[in-house]
Amino acid sequence: MTIKDFILKAKGFDVHEAINNSVRNNEQQLLSMNRDEQLFERGIDSNNRELPQYRPATIVAKMAKNQRFDHTTLKDTGEFHSNFKIITRPTEIEFTANSTPRDGRDLTIHLQARYGRDIFGLTEENKEKLRDMVRNEIIEDI
């Protein structure tokens, strides 16, 4: 690539578009950081706070199903975890989940009300990993 080509490419470079493309390219890894690493493995929200413990009845039910109960994972049937998604906007990304309302309640709304909106998103440690991913992809692009 000539210097002239590089300058022309740099002039047309949209940093927000590049970030969003990188997020989309790494979506499954980012979703795994949120739902698997933070929630399931560690029982923490995006602010690195431990989620409130399960109620005793939930612990008994999880034990009966041979599921993890030492901390809150927000994973019972797997429906909630399987519906995680990322919405990209020009200057932000949003982690969320779409759940199908059952028995008159929306699971995502119910879990957010119980555990807070911060169940979605990345910890500072994982945000740093995201920044590294994005930086590396942008450098490759340029």
Residue ranges and their predicted role:
Residues 1-142:
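Short, Lys/Arg-rich flexible segments
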